[in-house]
Design a protein with these regions (language model features):
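Glycoside hydrolase catalytic-domain context in secreted enzymes
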Residues: 1-209
Length: 209
């Protein structure tokens, strides 16, 4: 799943688990083991439990969704932090740094390497279902807070991930909608937090939208 187009002899080495966020190391290719967790308001639990565990399903709009990786008792526990928008309301990057410090500490305790956060999309829609993940509607503030969190996480030798690149400002049809944004607006608003994360935060990875 994580190595698209992987050679057949490599595929069996991928982890047999539910959640699928972890990538086993492949010594022959010099690839270390990477254990990935979701965010952004704390660790997304273990995200990977044994495939032998009976599935736990949730009915989501008529579709059965396997939520075993998030609900089974073997999934690691972590602190549920306040919303990112709440942290941004402080207008204080020290708050975001403290946020990242807690996350980084718990990642080390749980032997996790990659944090799929911070989220730096803008709260363009008041009813956006994921506004709690983002630092509000101001791109500069979002960038400042993201940089502080990234630095705190990566100071512990971990990998931060700026997401979702770019213009991922709505949930409805987000996997199929075509976003058309004026070039100036794109650069001044939607790209700014990502640019700051790369230039100022030296973020180690980026998640595409």
């Amino acid at each position: 799943q994580q190595l698209t187009g992987a050679l057949p002899e490599i595929v069996p080495e991928l982890p047999h688990c539910k959640g699928g966020r972890h990538v086993s190391g492949i010594a022959a290719l010099g690839i270390p083991t990477l254990r990935v967790t979701n965010g952004p308001v704390g660790l997304g639990q273990n995200d990977c439990v044994s495939a032998s565990i009976p599935p736990i399903y949730f009915n989501l709009g008529g579709e059965r969704v396997d939520i075993t990786a998030y609900t089974d008792a073997s999934s690691a526990k972590a602190t549920a932090l306040p919303s990112a928008m709440g942290a941004a309301a402080s207008f204080d990057p020290a708050v975001a740094a403290a946020y990242g410090d807690v996350i980084g500490t718990e990642m080390l305790n749980l032997a996790l390497h990659v944090f799929e956060a911070p989220g730096m999309n803008l709260s363009r829609l008041p009813i956006l279902g994921r506004n709690f993940e983002y630092f509000g509607e101001d791109p500069y503030l979002a960038g400042v807070m993201s940089v502080a969190e990234i630095k705190a996480v990566q100071a512990k030798g971990l990998i931060g991930m700026a997401k979702h690149f770019v213009a991922n400002e709505q949930e409805t049809n987000r996997t199929t909608v075509q976003e058309t944004v004026d070039r100036q607006v794109l650069r001044e608003l939607y790209l700014l937090p990502f640019e700051m994360s790369v230039k100022d935060g030296k973020v180690a990875s980026i998640m595409c939208a």
